[in-house]
Regions:
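N-terminal beta-strand motif that seeds the catalytic metal site of vicinal oxygen chelate
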Residues: 1-18, 43, 87-92, 144-166
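Alpha-helix termination/capping residues and helix-transition junctions
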Residues: 3, 26, 84, 109-111
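Core segments of cupin and vicinal oxygen chelate
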Residues: 12-63
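Short Gly/Pro-enriched turn/cap motifs at secondary-structure boundaries
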Residues: 38-39, 81, 116-117
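Acetyl-CoA-dependent GNAT
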Residues: 62-65, 141
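A short, polar/proline- and glycine-enriched secondary-structure boundary/capping micro-motif
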Residues: 69-74, 147-149
Length: 166
């Protein structure tokens, strides 16, 4: 059976309203499913799914008064683990180099701090963060990948700072 890609990626947030505003109004991802789940042990979980394109979804959960779930924690994965920003990130397809530049300009116009376009040889990217501190990326392929690309080898020297926002 062939692989079909992601159904969804699930993440947590401490502020679902702020998260929803960012993903709907800044990134223009449509909310396609919203739930309030009553937890038998107490509290509730608010849950929202965004369509990021091609029926691939990004989900966020916010726990309210759920036993065993801290009221405050670090929702930004990299900060929570103490690793550089680029290590855990989510990349969305831009479609083309022109669309990537257009997306960067749109994000800047909406007040988002965005990196310059980063050229990875096989792709170009921009990096920014959501209100939870999650590292996000828009990316586009600049060429087809080949057998040489699949070989683990030293290719370049990079700056972690260039690949993400401080």
């Amino acid at each position: 059976m062939p692989n079909r890609g992601f159904s969804h990626i699930g993440l947590s947030t401490l502020d679902l309203d702020r998260t929803r505003d960012f993903y709907e109004n800044i990134l223009k991802f449509k909310a396609v499913r919203c739930d309030i789940l009553k937890v038998k042990e107490g509290g509730q979980i608010r849950h929202i799914f965004f369509d990021t394109g091609r029926d691939q979804l990004l989900a966020f959960m916010e726990a309210r008064g759920v036993p065993g779930v801290p009221a405050h924690y670090e929702a930004g994965i990299n900060r929570g683990l103490g690793v550089p920003n680029a290590f855990y990130h989510f990349a969305f397809e831009a479609g083309s180099e022109a669309a990537l530049v257009e997306k960067r300009n749109e994000l800047i116009a909406r007040g988002v701090d965005v990196t310059d376009v980063v050229d990875h040889d096989w792709a170009k990217s921009i990096y920014f963060k959501d209100p939870n501190g999650l590292q996000l990326e828009f990316c586009c392929f600049t060429r087809n990948l080949n057998a040489n690309d699949a070989q683990l080898q030293e290719r370049a020297e990079v700056s972690i700072r260039r690949m993400g926002l401080e």
